[in-house]
């Protein structure tokens, strides 16, 4: 027992002798640490060494102020720190001045190493990530510079230098929303003047009202967003964008370079692109923009396909010259042949030649509340006639009832989240329709839809690898007319796309599943593969999945549908876009090829 007991007593005695010294030891590096940051204790530092360290730091500051960079580097070397009894990297002020002196001498690697040591010793000192950002910027490592500046701002979010530096980096990447996020923290940018060059052929009062900010004010991020939303809603400019120019006085000029949409009446090439882009599928698009220089737009569609005849026209304009409010009138007439042999399950024999004639007209209004919120509402009157359709279930007759219907529609669209420095946004939408078919035994019906749209641009600049995810769902209460049913499929008159389920067969609509309830997810990711002054080609994969059902069982997809493939988008002269789809239905293995065009 004694041979174990004696060593334990000896160990306890040694611990008692050592403990008081450890508890009261204070290092010179703790006294030198900036902003009260704690530094590692060094039990080897004696009082005379602490005094010597303070004297050395004062000498270093004098030498730095007088521009003697090499002498500062010599006095702050790791060897000099060891001579003072300081652990390497523990004296953060020594590391700071060493890094600054090396930077003055353009010895970037040594400067970065010194700042890294200082950052490790004093993680709450904003000087180190700020200076590291400066080195990264000079070496054109802009991503690293942004990361370091965000690190500095996590320590002090109000630091004027770091905010201005980071905002400038985002502005150089043409990411003005992100730049404003940081400039606004320090009361910048103050707008001296708004320049519109060249002046567009648009009523100056309408253009003036489109800007939510004015000279002499600080451009806030929310005002830029509102202005962009209003300029887009005018419908007369292609991709409107505002840029800032810094002035020697510290202010900024806001520059807007309008790029007018080219409808009919422009150059011959513009006329051809506008009017004839749909000729491959027997369609023309006569469009006129900015009529009477008052942001009045007329859009129309003429289709002579014998299975999908259609004439549609719409007129929109600012309400009383106020671009925040816009009204629209529309008229749409169509005569279509439908093949429902694989999508309508209540017929005694396949319905492969149903004809639908419909005329629809109405009016609506849109209001832009701000850059994050807008809403719409309208009223439509429609009439329809069905031919060559039959059914077993009497309940199915309600879908194919001839007659007129009155529908009220409303919707709201909001920016739910935005992280401009990450180039990420999340938008939400909600819409509803309330209608009544004026026919015997018909009851009111309602439809509701909701959706989320997430967009992410992973590159700091440009649109390479733009990723989009869209989630939508809809439901119907009551029995809506057949022409108001939801359709999941790729078809030019439909926007609920499953890109390997083509909505027509031998030219007739009806091959895509229909119903009163649906869920749909679309994802795609695009890479620019070719670009010149005339065109831009983007290619990327897509993935779609969804399901559509009907309470009666007369329509629906029966199971979840899953599609994947490639999509090619070719944008010509910044306007008309050609879209080509190569899709595969993962349920059946069927392949799909489809092409269409889109306007501005």
Tell me the role of every PLM-derived stretch.
Residues 53-85, 93, 97-106:
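Alpha-helical segment of the N-proximal tetratricopeptide repeat
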Residues 7-16:
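Bacterial N-terminal signal peptides
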Residues 103, 116-127, 134-277, 284-288, ...:
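Periplasmic polypeptide-binding modules associated with outer-membrane biogenesis and secretion
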Residues 223-428, 490-505, 511-515, 521, ...:
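Gram-negative/organellar outer-membrane beta-barrel architecture
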Residues 21-55, 62, 66, 84:
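Compositionally biased, proline/threonine/alanine/serine-rich low-complexity intrinsically disordered stretches
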Residues 405-537, 541-542, 549, 592-599:
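C-terminal outer-membrane beta-barrel translocator/porin domains of Gram-negative envelope proteins
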């Amino acid at each position: 027992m004694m041979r174990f007991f004696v060593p334990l007593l000896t160990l306890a005695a040694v611990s008692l002798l050592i403990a008081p010294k450890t508890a009261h030891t204070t290092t010179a590096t703790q006294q030198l640490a900036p902003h009260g940051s704690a530094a590692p204790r060094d039990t080897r530092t004696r009082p005379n060494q602490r005094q010597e360290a303070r004297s050395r730091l004062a000498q270093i500051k004098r030498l730095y102020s007088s521009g003697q960079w090499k002498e500062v580097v010599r006095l702050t070397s790791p060897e000099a720190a060891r001579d003072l009894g300081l652990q390497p990297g523990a004296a953060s002020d020594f590391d700071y001045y060493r890094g600054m002196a090396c930077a003055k001498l353009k010895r970037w690697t040594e400067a970065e190493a010194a700042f890294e040591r200082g950052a490790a010793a004093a993680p709450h000192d904003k000087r180190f990530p700020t200076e590291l950002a400066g080195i990264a910027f000079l070496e054109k490592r802009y991503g690293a510079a942004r990361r370091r500046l965000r690190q500095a701002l996590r320590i002090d979010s109000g630091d004027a230098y770091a905010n201005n530096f980071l905002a400038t980096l985002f502005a150089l990447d043409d990411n003005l929303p992100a730049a404003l996020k940081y400039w606004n923290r320090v009361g910048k940018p103050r707008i001296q003047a708004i320049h519109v060059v060249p002046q567009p052929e648009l009523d100056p009062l309408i253009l003036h009202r489109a800007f939510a900010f004015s000279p002499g004010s600080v451009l806030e991020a929310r005002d830029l967003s509102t202005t962009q939303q209003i300029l887009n809603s005018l419908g007369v400019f292609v991709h409107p964008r505002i840029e800032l120019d810094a002035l020697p006085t510290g202010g900024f000029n806001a520059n807007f370079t309008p790029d007018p949409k080219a409808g009919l009446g422009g150059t011959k090439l513009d006329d051809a692109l506008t009017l004839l882009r749909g000729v491959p599928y027997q369609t023309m698009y006569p469009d006129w923009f900015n009529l009477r220089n008052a942001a009045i737009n007329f859009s129309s569609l003429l289709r002579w396909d014998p299975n999908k005849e259609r004439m549609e026209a719409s007129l929109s304009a600012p309400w009383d010259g106020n671009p925040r409010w816009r009204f629209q009138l529309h008229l749409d007439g169509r005569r279509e042949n439908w093949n429902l042999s694989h999508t309508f399950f209540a017929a005694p024999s396949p319905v492969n030649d149903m004809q639908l004639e419909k005329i629809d007209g109405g009016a609506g209004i849109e209001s832009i509340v701000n850059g994050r919120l807008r809403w719409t509402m309208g009223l439509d009157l429609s009439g329809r006639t069905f031919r060559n359709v039959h059914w077993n279930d009497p309940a199915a007759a309600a879908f194919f009832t001839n007659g007129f219907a009155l529908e009220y529609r409303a919707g709201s669209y909001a920016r739910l989240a935005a992280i401009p420095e990450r180039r990420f946004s999340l938008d939400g939408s909600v819409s509803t329709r309330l209608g009544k078919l004026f026919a015997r035994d018909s009851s009111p019906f309602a439809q509701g839809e909701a959706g989320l749209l997430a967009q992410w641009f992973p590159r700091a600049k440009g649109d390479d690898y733009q990723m989009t995810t869209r989630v939508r769902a809809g439901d119907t209460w009551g029995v809506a007319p057949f022409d108001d049913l939801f359709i999941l499929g790729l078809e030019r008159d439909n926007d609920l796309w499953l890109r390997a389920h083509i909505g027509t067969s031998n030219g007739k609509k009806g091959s895509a599943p229909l119903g009163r309830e649906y869920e749909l997810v679309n994802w795609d990711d695009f890479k620019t593969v070719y670009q010149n002054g005339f065109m831009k080609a983007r290619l990327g994969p897509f993935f779609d999945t969804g399901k559509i059902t009907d309470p009666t069982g007369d329509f629906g997809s029966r199971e979840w549908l899953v599609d994947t493939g490639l999509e090619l988008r070719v944008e010509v002269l910044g306007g008309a876009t050609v879209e080509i789809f190569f899709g595969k239905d993962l349920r059946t293995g069927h392949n799909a090829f489809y092409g269409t065009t889109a306007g501005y």
